[in-house]
């Protein structure tokens, strides 16, 4: 395991909302929700920390957000402007290193093992970046510093907003043991529920399980979690990383015959894919359905749409059509997945912030 790398994960704090509050003094200190008209079928893209106190969060239906936060200020947002500010932030990153892996408009990994400023400490680099972003752009960022991407990302969320958490190699396992497994990158709702049923709530609980037992219960997630909780992750910061697809899949606890359950899963996946596409500022043209039967036979079907989309309704309708064409209901399903491929950036087009 390589512990010599110096990796920083920078995550802007409530990015879209913070830009709006910076630019519009009347929004400061108030619960601001980016996501459009709460009287229509929309989804929250992000919200200010004032709104989060009421339980509002990203990917939540705007109608639900309005019930939780009746005095919230709802706006559609200005995606073109957020792209512009994101580019300004990345320009600041480039003053320190060229090894930058953007994850979305508001977060990125930086490898500062050899940095342009000649700073020996990654902590100093991270603090300098935070201060530069604040002084030049009037925005706050949180930072995680460690020797690999997995730990750095978890650490950046540890002391939000405007915080920084540093995890040295000798501290990694103790740090990860105290973290709820729901905070582990890559652990979604379905995996979290499985872990909960197994009595695994923290990294310490996870560490008690053998590699074989985790793989048996969680398949590939178990393989990765066994390594992650021990600080083993050597994925490099990849400046040329370009996501080719966005998808979601789940393995059912019990094999499923009922097509209605499969359709419900596809609807949930479509919502999550929409939220991720919005965050990545991309839309796609091809919808892919994946089915794995109880005998482990796996099929994939795809449908190319007439136009690019990041709309959950359109994604779901395409996936449901593929399901009706592919599934007869005679054999039970072990796994179902939905992926949108053939992606391209939205950038200055009118990115849809309203979904389901």
Swiss-Prot record:
GO molecular-function term, one example from the UniProt record: damaged DNA binding
An individual GO BP term: DNA-templated DNA replication
SUPFAM superfamilies linked: DNA/RNA polymerases, Lesion bypass DNA polymerase (Y-family), little finger domain
Cofactor(s) recorded in Swiss-Prot or TrEMBL: Mg(2+)
Superkingdom of the source species: Bacteria
Cofactor binding description: Binds 2 magnesium ions per subunit.
Residue span, UmuC domain: 7-188
Catalytic activity: DNA(n) + a 2'-deoxyribonucleoside 5'-triphosphate = DNA(n+1) + diphosphate
Residues that bind Mg(2+): 11, 106
One GO cellular component term: cytosol
Enzyme active site: 107
Record's keyword terms, sorted: Cytoplasm, DNA damage, DNA repair, DNA replication, DNA-binding, DNA-directed DNA polymerase, Magnesium, Metal-binding, Mutator protein, Nucleotidyltransferase, Transferase
Substrate discrimination (site feature) positions: 16
Compartment(s): Cytoplasm
EC number: 2.7.7.7
Main subcellular location of this protein, as a coarse class: cytoplasm
Homology family: Belongs to the DNA polymerase type-Y family.
Function: Poorly processive, error-prone DNA polymerase involved in untargeted mutagenesis. Copies undamaged DNA at stalled replication forks, which arise in vivo from mismatched or misaligned primer ends. These misaligned primers can be extended by PolIV. Exhibits no 3'-5' exonuclease (proofreading) activity. May be involved in translesional synthesis, in conjunction with the beta clamp from PolIII.
Subunit structure: Monomer.
Protein name: DNA polymerase IV
Species annotation: Listeria welshimeri serovar 6b (strain ATCC 35897 / DSM 20650 / CCUG 15529 / CIP 8149 / NCTC 11857 / SLCC 5334 / V8)
Gene (UniProt): dinB
């Amino acid at each position: 395991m390589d512990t010599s790398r110096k990796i920083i994960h920078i995550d802007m704090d409530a990015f879209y909302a913070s830009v709006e509050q910076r630019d519009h003094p009347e929004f400061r200190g108030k619960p601001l929700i980016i996501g459009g008209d709460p009287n229509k079928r929309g989804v929250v893209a992000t919200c200010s920390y004032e709104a989060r106190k009421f339980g509002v969060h990203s990917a939540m239906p705007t109608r639900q957000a309005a019930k939780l936060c009746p005095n919230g200020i709802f706006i559609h947002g200005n995606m073109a402007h957020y792209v512009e500010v994101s580019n300004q932030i990345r320009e600041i990153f480039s003053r320190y290193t060229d090894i930058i892996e953007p994850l979305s408009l508001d977060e990125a990994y930086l490898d500062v093992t050899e940095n342009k400023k000649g700073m020996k400490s990654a902590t100093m680099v991270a603090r300098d970046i935070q201060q530069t972003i604040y002084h030049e752009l009037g925005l706050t960022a949180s930072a995680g510093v460690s020797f690999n991407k997995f730990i750095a990302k978890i650490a950046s969320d540890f002391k939000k907003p405007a915080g920084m958490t540093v995890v040295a190699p000798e501290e990694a396992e103790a740090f990860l043991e105290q973290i709820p497994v729901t905070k582990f990158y890559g652990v979604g709702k379905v995996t979290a529920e499985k872990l909960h049923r197994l009595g695994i709530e923290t990294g310490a609980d996870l560490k008690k399980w053998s590699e074989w037992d985790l793989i048996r219960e969680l398949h590939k997630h178990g393989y990765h979690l066994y390594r992650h909780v021990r600080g083993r992750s050597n994925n490099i910061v990849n400046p040329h990383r370009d996501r080719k697809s966005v998808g979601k899949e789940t393995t059912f606890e019990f094999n499923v015959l009922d097509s209605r359950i499969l359709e419900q899963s596809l609807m949930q996946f479509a919502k999550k894919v929409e939220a991720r596409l919005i965050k990545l500022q991309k839309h796609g043209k091809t919808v892919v359905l994946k089915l794995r039967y109880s005998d482990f036979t796996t099929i994939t079907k795809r449908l190319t749409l007439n136009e690019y989309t990041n709309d959950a309704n359109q994604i779901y309708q395409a996936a449901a059509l593929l399901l009706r064409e592919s599934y007869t209901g005679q054999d039970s399903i072990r796994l179902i997945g939905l992926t949108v491929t053939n992606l391209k950036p939205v950038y200055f087009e009118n990115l849809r912030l309203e979904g389901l």
